[in-house]
Structures are given as C-alpha cells and as structure tokens.
C-alpha cells in the first residue's frame, strides 16, 4: 500500500458527508411532517405534558408561580391608578385639536398670526410630545396588554379548576340511591354500541347535548328491574398542582384589584386574603380529605386482615380457648368449591401426596355411613375396614379416648352385624356405602318390604336405628354429635 492510499484513507470524509446528508434529510422530514400534519405535533406535546408528574411540583412551582402572578397584577394596578390615571387627559388629548397654526383665517391677518404663534410657544401645547409623556403612553399600552393576559390566564385556571377535573365511575353494585347531584341512574343498554348509534341518528342539538352533558336518565324506572339499572357517579377530583395554583392565583383577589382603587394599603388586604385562603383550602380541607383516605385505607386493611385473609390463609384462624395445650390453630380440612357448571366439589388435602383429592359426592337418597362421616370430618381420603381408627386422623389429647372408643364400638358393631347378616340373609340400608358400584349391591335386588321386615326382626335393630339417626343428622350439627 502506497503513501497516497494512506493519505486518502486518512482524509476520507465520505462518512461525515453521509451523516450530514442524513441529518439534513431528517430535518426535511420533520419540517414536512410539521407542515402537513400539525395535529401530530399537538398530540406529542400533550403526551409529554401528561407524562410529567405535576403534583410533585405543587409546592415548589405552583404556589410561587401563583403568588408571583398576583403580586404582578397588584403592581400593575397600583401604577395604573397612581401614575397613568392622573395624566390620562394629557396622554389621550388630540394633537390637532387647538393647533392655531393650521387655521387659514389667522394666516390672512399678520397680527393674529403673531399672537397665535406667541400663545402656542408660551402655553406649551406640544408638551405631550416630550419624552416623559411618550414613556407614559408606552407604559399604559403595556399595562393594558399585561392586564388582559393575566385576566385571561386567571379565567382559564379558574374554569380548569372548577370544571376540568371530573372522573366518571359506573357503580354496578350500588342498590341504595343517595341524594347527590353527581349521582345519576342509567340503563345497562346505555353501554351498548346500539345506544351510540341511536345518538348519531338524532339531531345536531341532541348530539351536542350528549357531548357536553353526557347521558342523563333521571326517570323513575318503574317498569325496570334493579338488575337492569346501574348508577353513574361524576366525581370532582382536582390535582394537587391545580389546587395550589388556584389558591395562590385566586379569582377573588383579581376581581378585587380590578374594580377598586389600589393603593399601598391594599397590599395588607391581599396578603391577608392569600393567607386565609391557603390555610382553609390547603392546610385544612385538603388535609381533611387525606385523613379520610387514611381512615378508608385502614378500614379496608382491617376488613382484609380479619375476613379475607382469614378465609384464604389456613393457619390464620387461631383458637384462643383455654386448654391444657394452650392456643392452637384450627385449619379447615375439607374445602368446598364449585365447578364452572355450578356443581359442588368437596376436596381434602392429602399431606402424603401433597395434593387435593376430590371426595365422593353426597346424594340425598343414600346417606353416608358413620365411618364415611368421620373420614370426611378428619380430612382423610382413604380408610381401611380392618383398622381400629382412620389413618391420619389426629385427635386432641382431651378428646382422643372418646373418639377411639366410638370408632372401636362402631367397627365391632359393623363386623358383628355383617357376620349375622351373612348367616341370616338380611340386609341393612347402610351396608353398601363403601362398595365401588351401586348396581352390584344386593340391597337393590331385595324388595323394600322384605328388607324392612328383616331389619325389624334383627337383634341389632336398636343399634342400627341409633346408627341411622346419627348419620341422618344435619351437617351443621357435627360438632354437637361428636361432643355428646
């Protein structure tokens, strides 16, 4: 590679030229977009303004800005009443009203012309052309323009504060109608697209009325159900930035300064007005609203801790009754849910498999046996017929002897009844609950009258009647049954 090639590579500015062309083309595209679609620029500016957290600048920007605008308005009104108003006639007098040099009659007579010229020089008819009055005239025009800008800005801030911060809430679960002008009643059909299509078909006045007022339906709704009606709340929620700006640049102070003669003593009234308004709205009313939010949050948190979390968390329900073991947690073992079709599903948690298992469905025609009910109460998925007590059934220290004796008596009674029934051929209605299939049960092959006669003649008649009565008890009385 020669020296010329190295020099050409060192001084190769093709990349720089390409970047300059790209920058120029980008600027051309931006100017073209600005000229062809100015609304896009407006959308971008509004998006940038909405992304700013204005409430964070409420104390540092809004309040000083409002106080500065109020003081500026006071100074301008003070100068207008004490500097411009005394010289109002001299500033607004016409320059050619008493100009005798322009009179043709006086020019015809020489002595009258001399008198008129001396009279004008001695009385200074052209005093308004001096630098002092020229400056006052400029200040007068500047003050008028500034007053117009400040009044327009104050009008915009006031209208924005009072009418520009409303949020609409649709309340579908509210049943009681409150006496509030912001709460209106509507039909659920108003939320459909057909409702808006009907509005577009109406007159221009109806469309404008709906655009500015919204959909209002204050009728009695006599022929409508409560499920077809919802309430709409239009709540006024001004931002913290706008509240501080409105308080510091209030329309009451501006109106007071506009229609009164302003002097230095008027500053005392303005300072007192600013302090009282800031104290009432910002330090009292706004803090009262914040305190209400704190109380509402505390009440909601208390409800969540006591009712919602107590049902979600199994270990949060604490039994505070005095016992030998102290306080212990009560964990529900059987969980009742519903499927998408509305069917009730009863599940129990298996600690060995660490998963939920569905319990067999309980029908009204065939009640469950005592063993099945004890199994459901204890939360066990499988129980063997030859065991003295269910697997995994945990008794308390005080109630374990009672439950153990009950289960042993129940197993002995069932085993003896089964042996006797195999010999005698009688069948009881609570024998086939643990069998896999109901179609293979011999109870269905024996008529009901024969079963009843054999059951009444059995020696275990009293025992089985008590057993059936205990099984047919209400599920809500399980605790009373076990405690008895």
From Swiss-Prot:
UniProt keyword terms in alphabetical order: Membrane, Nucleus, Phosphoprotein, Transmembrane, Transmembrane helix
Pfam families: DUF2418
Disulfide bond residue pairs: none
Comp. bias regions, Polar residues: 430-440
Transmembrane segments: 145-165, 252-272
Record keyword Transmembrane helix present: yes
Positions of the UniProt region annotated as Disordered: 416-457
InterPro entries, per the entry: Nur1/Mug154
GO terms, biological process: maintenance of rDNA; regulation of exit from mitosis
Localization per record: Nucleus membrane
Residues that bear Phosphoserine: 3, 417, 474
Membrane topology field: Multi-pass membrane protein
GO cellular component: nuclear membrane; nuclear periphery
Chief place where the protein resides: nucleus
Other noteworthy facts: Present with 606 molecules/cell in log phase SD medium.
Function: Member of a perinuclear network that controls recombination at multiple loci to maintain genome stability. Required for rDNA repeat stability.
Similarity comment: family membership: Belongs to the NUR1 family.
Quaternary data: Interacts with CSM1.
Protein name, entry field: Nuclear rim protein 1
Organism of provenance: Saccharomyces cerevisiae (strain ATCC 204508 / S288c) (Baker's yeast)
């Amino acid at each position: 590679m020669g020296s010329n090639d190295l020099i050409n590579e060192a001084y190769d500015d093709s990349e720089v030229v390409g970047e300059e062309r790209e920058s120029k083309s980008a600027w051309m595209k931006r100017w073209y977009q600005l000229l062809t679609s100015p609304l896009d620029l407006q959308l971008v500016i509004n998006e940038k303004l909405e992304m700013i957290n204005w409430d964070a600048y409420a104390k540092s920007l809004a309040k000083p800005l409002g106080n500065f605008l109020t003081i500026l308005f006071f100074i301008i009104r003070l100068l207008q009443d004490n500097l411009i108003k005394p010289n109002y006639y001299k500033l607004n007098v016409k320059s050619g009203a008493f100009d005798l040099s322009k009179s043709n009659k006086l020019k015809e007579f020489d002595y009258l012309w001399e008198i008129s010229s001396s009279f004008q020089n001695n009385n200074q008819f052209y005093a308004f052309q001096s630098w002092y009055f020229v400056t006052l005239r400029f200040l007068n025009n500047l003050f008028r323009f500034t007053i117009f800008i400040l009044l327009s800005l104050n009008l915009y801030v006031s209208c924005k504060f009072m009418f520009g911060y409303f949020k609409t809430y649709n309340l579908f679960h509210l049943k009681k109608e409150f006496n509030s002008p912001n709460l209106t009643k509507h039909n659920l059909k108003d939320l459909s697209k057909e409702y808006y299509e009907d509005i577009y078909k109406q007159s221009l006045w109806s469309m404008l009325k709906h655009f500015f007022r919204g959909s209002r339906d204050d009728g009695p709704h006599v022929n409508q159900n409560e499920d077809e009606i919802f309430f709409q709340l239009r709540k006024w929620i001004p931002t913290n930035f706008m509240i501080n700006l409105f308080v510091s640049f209030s329309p009451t102070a501006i109106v007071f300064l506009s229609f009164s003669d302003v002097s230095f003593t008027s500053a005392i009234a303005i300072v007192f007005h600013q302090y009282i308004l800031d104290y009432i709205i910002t330090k009292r009313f706004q803090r009262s609203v914040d305190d209400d939010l704190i109380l509402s949050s505390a009440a909601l948190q208390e409800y969540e801790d006591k009712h919602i979390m107590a049902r979600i968390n199994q270990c949060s329900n604490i039994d505070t009754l005095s016992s030998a073991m102290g306080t212990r947690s009560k964990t529900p073992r059987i969980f009742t849910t519903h499927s998408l079709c509305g069917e009730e599903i009863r599940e129990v948690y298996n600690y060995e498999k660490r998963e939920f298992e569905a319990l067999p469905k309980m029908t009204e025609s065939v009640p469950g046996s005592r063993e099945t009910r004890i199994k459901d109460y204890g939360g066990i998925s499988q129980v063997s017929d030859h065991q003295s007590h269910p697997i995994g059934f945990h008794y308390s220290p005080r109630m374990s002897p009672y439950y153990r004796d009950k289960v042993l008596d129940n197993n002995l009674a069932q085993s003896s009844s089964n042996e006797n029934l195999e010999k005698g051929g009688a069948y009881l209605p609570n024998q086939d609950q643990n069998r896999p299939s109901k179609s293979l049960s011999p109870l269905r092959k024996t008529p009901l009258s024969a079963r009843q006669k054999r059951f009444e003649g059995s020696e275990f008649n009293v025992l089985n009647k008590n057993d059936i009565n205990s099984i047919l008890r209400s599920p809500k009385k399980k605790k009373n049954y076990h405690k008895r």
